[in-house]
Amino acid sequence: MENNYILRRLRYTFDINDKQMIKIWANADTTVTREQISAWLKKEDDPAYIMCNDLNLAKFLNGFIIKHRGKSDGPQVAPESRLNNNIILRKLKIALTLRDDDVIEILALADKPIGKSELSAFFRKKGHQHYREMQDQLLRRFMQGLQTKHRGENESPQDVKVDITQEKQQNNSADQTEDAGINSHIWNKKK
């Protein structure tokens, strides 16, 4: 998932201004400027857009954890140089002190119900036989559910509406392909 999308979504959901965003990065011992934040929050088609790399998003999420949970004793957790959706979800779960039931409820708010076993697969170590990689669509729905929970809105910022529309189109074409495969399988059995 695009890191800039995560930043835009968190900023909108929790109504975080530039000064607060600078403070969140400072919590993770990182200095950023308003100009950097502005460039990271721009849409891709804007000429001033700059992609936020994994390291900067990891630092932001670590700072977000500190903002919500306080600084832990001892050395701070080193930010990951490579992020995936599973790590992003885990960091948000920690920051917001969410239990598995809370995450399931948030996904249900975004019309994406899942079970506990499916959710636990996202938190397993890579390489574990039950580990499952979280797809962009599911993280996008989690972010949408967070917004509904914290802002009480079903409406999304414009860039998010486009993402969800594209997701529905992908799901519909996947369903049609699957239906066609099932129908041809049934047809072949009848012959």
Which residues make up each language-model segment?
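A short, Lys/Arg-rich alpha-helix, primarily the initiator
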Residues: 1-13, 79-92
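Residue-level marker of regulatory loop/turn positions in helix-turn-helix DNA-binding domains and
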Residues: 49, 53, 81, 85, ...
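Short N-terminal segments
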Residues: 1-2, 33-35, 161-162
